[in-house]
Amino acid sequence: MAAAFSHVIFDLDGTLLNTLDDLAAAGNHTCEMHGWPTFTVDEYRYKVGNGMLKLVERFMPAEYAGDGRAFEQSLAEFRAYYGEHKEDHTAPYAGTIEMLDRLRAAGIQFAVLTNKDHISAAPLIEKYFGSERFALVQGRVDAFPPKPEAPVTLHVMKELGANPATTLYVGDSNVDILTGHNAGLKSAGVSWGFRGRAELEAAGADYVVDTQDELAKLILGE
C-alpha cells in the first residue's frame, strides 16, 4: 500500500521536542531581572507558539505595551538566557525518534517549520535528531512572516519539491492547524503537546492523534 503522504512538515516545540520548561525558565528569568511577575510552566503553554517576539510581549506587564525600548531589552535578555539554557530540560517526546526512523525507512521526506528563531531551532534539531533525518529545518527569519502566514510554508514546500495534495503539516496548536490550511495542506494535531485535543479540534484539524504510532500509521496509510 502506498503511503498516504509523501512529505511531512513538523512543528518543533510541543510536537517533536518538549521545550516548555526551558522556555518558561528563560521567560521567568527575564521577568525577574525587571522585578515583574513570573508565571507557572502551565501558563507558558498559552504564551508560546507564535515565536519569541510574541512570547516576550505576552510575559511583559500590560503597562509596558508599546514600550519599544523595554521590549527590545527584554527580547535580548530572553534570547541570551535561552541560548545558554535551551538544552537544560528539553528532550524529544517518547517514541519520536522511532517514529521518524520508521517514516524515513518508508521513503517519507520530512522537514521542520517552526516559529522559534532559526538560530535556536537548527542546533536543537542537530543535537536531538542528528543531521540526516530532516531534509530541511526552517526557523523564524526576517525574510518571512511567522506561521500561520503561508509564505514560509510555501517556501519549505518549494525547497522539498512537495505536492500539497500529498504533504501533511503536523503540530500541537491552533497556529499549526492554520499553518497547514493556509498553505493548502491537510493538518494533523498531536494531543501530547502544549495545547491538547480540544484546541486542535476547535481549530479544524483534519486529524488528531494521541501517539507517535498513530501518527506514523496515518502518514503511511496503514
Model feature map: region roles:
Residues M1-H7, R104, H118, A122-E222:
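Asp-based, Mg2+/Mn2+-dependent phosphohydrolase catalytic module
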Residues A2-E98, A105-A106, I119, S131:
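N-terminal helical cap/lid subdomain that shapes the substrate entry/recognition surface
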Residues L16, P92, F110-L113, Y169-V170, ...:
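Conserved SAM-binding loop
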Residues T30, G51, E77-D88, A111, ...:
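Hydrophobic, well-ordered secondary-structure segments
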